Swiss-Prot record:
Gene: GT2
GO molecular function: hexosyltransferase activity
Protein name, as recorded: Probable glycosyltransferase 2
Record topology, Cytoplasmic segments: 1-49
Glycosylation sites: N74, N124, N129, N458
Annotated InterPro entries: Glyco_trans_34 (IPR008630), Nucleotide-diphossugar_trans (IPR029044)
Species of provenance: Oryza sativa subsp. indica
Lumenal side: 73-480
Length: 480
């Protein structure tokens, strides 16, 4: 699920200066005294076209080699570069800058040449070998970033918290302050029913947050047009981390995921020395290199420098277009079971953690003792059985904490599963969770597939006593 929109691509030229290609269009024939030099004009036009082709071919080759050289075709950590390697890489960057300057200096630029110049500005690097490619890619990354490089966020945040005691990083009971973040597209769904179920999933998240003292943000804006689709969450998370230093944990949750255990609480004390909490399996990640070893539909980031650094390292595969397409080929070649499609945020994170394990994994907690992400297909038809045999508050397969409708896409015009099955299953999941909320007020749904409700507890003259005696983890009746 993604959103984000203010561009941070400093490599993109606008009108005017900045080293981009000149934006003056060729003068039409007959509109100037210079038209008498038609032969010279045609010669320069042919030469300019040839130069544009050179730019396009050069940039395409550089991008392919840079991505392959940097990301690699294996999952081993790259050797640390020596001083000589760094010097060679710097020379490579200098050489390619010189070549592009020479090409740009000859003749004007039409729209195609301007587009090629933009690409060249983002990837002004050569790739004679893997070391030089890495140096060149690092140079390109400087031109595309989520935002200005921040290196002292922990210190800035500590100072802010000291200066603003009215905004502590903890809430009642000393619990860390959490901000749940979700989002959806700014326009209406292709399927009208999609908006209805989007409202239900949002209501479900609001209910859980209200019960557990968690703040919530539902974003509708595209904050970065380069990171659309799967990737839109990254710039949003960064913006929220920096805008809310009082928040200790940022919790991303896809719009198609629902809380289905309203009594379960995150065991945050378990994660004292970790900064990323994500559902997954160690064996699928490190032994099988599976593309579904982790799930980025629901995960938590600590608000700290480490998380900012990870976002910066995670984002470079995300810019839409050629870069994302080429990165997708590399991910498919290296992650088991991954279909051939453009780079997605989940595969990119898995690849990053595999290829740079020593750098990141000591701060990552791969959680599977409860369902921070629970795949819906194996859960929704077992809710009655769960209600018969178990109770809320468990969070695992007995009573899943989160049910995630991966592949359903209720807001889109297509999905991996029949839309009728998806909508029926989402209705069951919502009502299963909603019963846990409604019983606080003495009501319940007549059935898991019915929006209608019934009274399950009579009103009394001593409602406070009833409230105090209510156990949110008690079993829920399955009778209609």
């Amino acid at each position: 699920m993604g959103q984000e929109g203010m561009g941070y691509n400093n490599g993109k030229g606008g009108g005017g200066g900045g080293g981009g290609l000149p934006m003056t269009a060729p003068r039409p024939r007959g509109a100037s005294p210079l038209s008498s030099h038609g032969h010279h004009h045609r010669s320069r036009k042919i030469h300019r076209t040839f130069n544009n082709v050179k730019i396009t071919v050069l940039c395409g080759l550089v991008t392919i080699l840079v991505l392959r050289g940097t990301i690699g075709l294996n999952l081993s950590l790259p050797n640390q570069p020596t001083d000589a390697d760094a010097l060679a890489g710097a020379k490579a960057v200098e050489d390619i800058d010189r070549i592009l300057r020479e090409i740009r200096s000859d003749g004007g630029a039409d729209d195609d040449a301007a587009a090629a110049g933009d690409l060249a500005g983002s990837f002004n690097a050569t790739a004679l070998n893997a070391t030089e490619a890495a140096a060149a890619y690092a140079s390109a990354v400087e031109r595309y970033a989520l935002g200005p490089k921040i290196s002292d966020w922990d210190g800035q945040r500590r100072r802010w918290l000291r200066q603003n005691p009215g905004f502590p990083s903890t809430v009642a009971g000393g619990k860390p302050r959490i901000l749940l973040v979700t989002g959806s597209q700014p326009g209406p769904c292709d399927n009208p029913l999609g908006d209805h179920y989007l409202l239900k999933t949002t209501k479900n998240k609001i209910d859980y947050c209200r019960l557990h003292g968690i703040e919530i943000v539902h974003n509708l804006a595209h904050l970065d047009t380069e990171l659309a689709g799967y990737w839109a969450k990254l710039p949003l998370l960064r913006r929220l981390m920096l805008s809310h230093p009082e928040v200790e944990w940022i919790w991303w949750m896809d719009s198609d995921a629902l809380f289905t255990d309203m009594a379960f609480e995150l065991p945050l004390s378990r994660y004292q020395d970790r900064n990323l909490i994500i559902h997954g399996y160690q064996d699928l990640l490190f032994e099988k290199h599976s593309w579904i070893a982790l799930n980025t539909g629901s995960f938590l980031f600590r608000n700290c420098q480490w998380s900012l650094d990870l976002l910066d390292a995670w984002a470079p595969m995300g810019p839409k277009g050629f870069i994302r397409d080429e990165a997708g080929k590399i991910l498919t070649a290296n992650l088991k079971g991954r279909p051939a499609f453009e780079a997605d945020d989940q595969s990119a994170l898995i690849y990053l953690l595999l290829s740079q394990k020593e750098k990141w994994m000591n701060k990552v907690f791969i959680e599977n003792s409860y369902y921070l992400h629970g795949f819906w297909a194996g859960l929704v038809d077992k809710y009655e059985e769960m209600m018969e045999n178990h109770h809320p508050g468990l969070g695992d397969e007995r009573w899943p904490f989160v049910t995630h409708f991966v592949g359903c896409k209720p807001c889109g015009s297509y999905g991996d599963y029949p839309v009728e099955r998806c909508l029926r299953s989402m209705e069951r999941a919502f009502n299963f969770a909603d019963n846990q909320v409604l019983r606080l007020y003495g009501f319940a749904h007549k059935g898991l597939e019915s929006p209608k409700i019934k009274r399950v507890r009579n009103q009394t003259t001593k409602p406070i006593d009833d409230k105090e005696n209510l156990d949110v983890k008690a079993k829920i009746s399955t009778t209609s």
